[in-house]
């Protein structure tokens, strides 16, 4: 009887270990890390003019992958890029199609029921992209159409903000930020709601940037982080260790400059974020 019980415990232990085998085991086996990225969310995660993944979050994940080569002692670790959309991004992590989600992902408590998050990677806030000849603030949007990307925390926050302010407006859902820009350019919506840095990038890449502007006020605060599989503590620790080294060593500066511009540097609040978030070994 005791032998049978011991055998059962041994079997359950093996099965438990197998079930909890996470990203690090797969990375070691395949000698590759799979990075999920968006094709339509500049300046954080997008496909550039020559069809390559680019943006701040993508560059940051490349730096994380480089740190993992040192942690795992795998100098030939390769990076595989997995394109995702705003709608499919979390499913890619949950269904084990990607190891790390590298795009402007807002870390929220409700999302932590689906995935785990790294230490913070960025801080942004949502606002309105408006036409220079149109209404310029949220109060002036009553009875008008406001575009927002579908299936995002930004959409939820827009609806909540309108409700709290007692403003009745039509919320127009878009599949991509580019679609929102086109609707605003064509006068089909009065404003487009998204994170400010994304809006600034959209304006810079538009056909007539002088006709567009970003409203002055922040309507939300969005802390970004890298998403990974729920419950994969070993991988999250490895990612957090990599990010902490990047923050504490100052490597985050060149990564930031490459993504935004040669002279750009993190804002004072971002600098504080990186100092606080970078954990010692």
Located regions from the model:
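Bacterial N-terminal signal peptides
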Residues: 4-14
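Extended ligand-binding regions for polar small-molecule ligands
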Residues: 24, 58-67, 134-135, 139-153, ...
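Extracytoplasmic small-molecule ligand-binding "clamshell" domains
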Residues: 25-101
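Beta->alpha turn/N-cap motifs
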Residues: 37-41, 82-87, 96-108, 149-153, ...
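Periplasmic-binding protein-like
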Residues: 39-40, 121-132, 196, 203-243, ...
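Ligand-binding cleft/hinge of the Venus flytrap
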Residues: 49, 62-78, 154-173, 203-208
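Short helix-initiation/N-cap motifs at beta->coil->alpha
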Residues: 74-91, 133, 172-182, 220-222
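A ligand-binding cleft/hinge motif common to bilobed small-molecule-binding domains
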Residues: 88, 102-114, 157-164, 183-220, ...
């Amino acid at each position: 009887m005791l032998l049978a019980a011991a055998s059962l415990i041994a079997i359950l232990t093996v099965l438990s270990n197998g079930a909890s085998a996470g990203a690090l085991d797969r990375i070691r086996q395949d000698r590759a890390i799979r990075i999920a990225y968006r094709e339509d969310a500049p300046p954080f995660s997008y496909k550039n003019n020559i069809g390559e993944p680019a943006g701040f979050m993508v560059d940051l994940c490349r730096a994380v992958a480089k740190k993992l080569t040192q942690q795992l002692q795998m100098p030939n670790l390769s990076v595989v890029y997995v394109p995702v959309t705003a709608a499919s991004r979390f499913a890619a992590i949950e269904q084990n199609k990607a190891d790390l989600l590298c795009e402007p992902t807002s870390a929220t408590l409700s999302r932590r029921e689906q995935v785990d998050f790294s230490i913070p990677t960025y801080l942004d806030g949502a606002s309105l992209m408006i036409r220079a000849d149109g209404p310029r603030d949220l109060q002036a949007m009553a009875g008008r159409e406001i575009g927002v990307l579908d299936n995002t925390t930004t959409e939820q926050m827009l609806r909540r903000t309108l409700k709290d302010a007692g403003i009745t407006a039509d919320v127009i859902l878009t599949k991509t930020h580019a679609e929102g820009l086109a609707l605003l350019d064509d006068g089909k919506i009065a404003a487009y709601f998204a994170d400010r840095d994304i809006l600034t990038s959209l304006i810079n890449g538009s056909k007539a940037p002088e006709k567009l502007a970003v409203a002055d006020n922040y309507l939300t605060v969005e802390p970004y982080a890298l998403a990974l599989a729920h419950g994969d503590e070993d991988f999250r620790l490895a990612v957090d260790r990599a990010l902490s080294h990047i923050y504490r060593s100052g490597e985050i500066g060149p990564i930031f400059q490459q993504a935004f511009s040669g002279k750009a540097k993190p804002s004072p609040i971002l600098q504080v974020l990186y100092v606080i978030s970078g954990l010692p070994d």
